[in-house]
Amino acid sequence: MAEVGPGRVTVSRLGRGLRLGHRRPQTWEISDSDGEGVPAREVGTQAPSPAGERRAAAKALRADQVLGRLVVCVDPAVLEDAGSDILMEALGTLGCECRIEPQHQARSLQWNVVRPDPAPSNVPLEAKAENEQEQLLLLEPQEFLQGAAQLTQITDPPCSIPWLSPKSLTRSHLAVIGLDAYLWSHQLSSQKTWQLKKSKEAHARGAISWAEVEEILVLLQLHANLDVLLMASWQELSQYVCAFTRALSQLPSKQHRDSQAFSFCTAGHWASGQQVTRDGSGLRGVWWRQIRQFNRVSPAVADAVVTAFPSPRLLQQALLDCSTEQERLSLLADLPVKAHKGKQPRRVGPDLSRRICIFLTTTNPDLLLDLSS
């Protein structure tokens, strides 16, 4: 017993308690203390509250959070160009992860998003599906012109794109650096016509003009939904890649925001408009709001017009019944407006009467209603 430290301490405590005549409380037993620890552990493992889940979901959708989970995969062939250092330096300062990995297509960049672990249950997928991932393919000017020359020989809309694999599941974009400088360096005489170097097995030497290049750009945009970015330098390409990466980080929050109903459409009062039931109750309130949309119209003036003519159809019919144009323009001018205590009674006035009359009777969409504007 002397060698067992905990046992010796327990016995001495019990002995002192018995000698002093104190009764040991029953909660001193080990079984009771174990029972008290179970609820404490259960409290720590309780499911998070709905408010906590909403906060976690909102935080996970923030652009800075998504940007930290973005992974830009760069093909090693991109690094063979001397200007690629500018691109890699820009990606390094952006805040996302950059990986050098072989891609399905050489000289390409691909964007992926890593889900948070663990991910909140009500957080939508911030990354697009795998078959909708974004890819940027870098092309040399000569490579782009060779593919463009093939497209110029096709009369029907292209079924396949020369630079892209038909089995590719990514949404691709093309980027050509220095195309304009390349074309100018291969200019013939005074026209913008440049020779395309082709292999011996291909067709004979052909030529393509800048106008044909522009037609190819339109063709790719309309029929293949393919964007072609013409960059002057690697610096310009780096700026585009950074802007595109930031846009991808903002996309989840925008998609989630657009998928949610506006609060004022369902629960708001001031912006939800006037509720109209099937039996027509509420139409008078809509008519009152329409009168209030005119410039310099107070609620009391709108009340006077709506009281005299509870619907726009009744007012329009009264305007048609007027025999002269002057009578029509001044139909509402003498309507009394309820005045507050201590103020002089007033009328709607000829200006508002004229504006409402023109609004309901004119067929000229360019007619100016408010002469003072």
UniProtKB/Swiss-Prot annotation:
GO biological process: DNA recombination; double-strand break repair; replication fork processing; telomere maintenance
Keywords carried by this UniProt record: DNA damage, DNA recombination, DNA repair, Nucleus
One term of GO molecular function: double-stranded DNA endonuclease activity
Pfam families for this protein: EME1-MUS81_C, ERCC4
UniProt region (Nuclease-like domain), positions on chain: 47-260
Residue ranges, annotated region (Disordered): 24-52
Assigned GO CC terms: endodeoxyribonuclease complex; Holliday junction resolvase complex; nuclear replication fork
Localization terms from the record: Nucleus
Region (Helix-hairpin-helix (2HhH)): 282-373
Major subcellular site: nucleus
Family the entry assigns: Belongs to the EME1/MMS4 family.
Function: Non-catalytic subunit of the structure-specific, heterodimeric DNA endonuclease MUS81-EME2 which is involved in the maintenance of genome stability. In the complex, EME2 is required for DNA cleavage, participating in DNA recognition and bending. MUS81-EME2 cleaves 3'-flaps and nicked Holliday junctions, and exhibit limited endonuclease activity with 5' flaps and nicked double-stranded DNAs. MUS81-EME2 which is active during the replication of DNA is more specifically involved in replication fork processing.
Quaternary context: Part of the heterodimeric MUS81-EME2 complex; the complex forms specifically during the DNA replication phase of the cell cycle.
Name under which the protein is recorded: Structure-specific endonuclease subunit EME2
Organism: Mus musculus (Mouse)
Organismal lineage: Eukaryota, Metazoa, Chordata, Craniata, Vertebrata
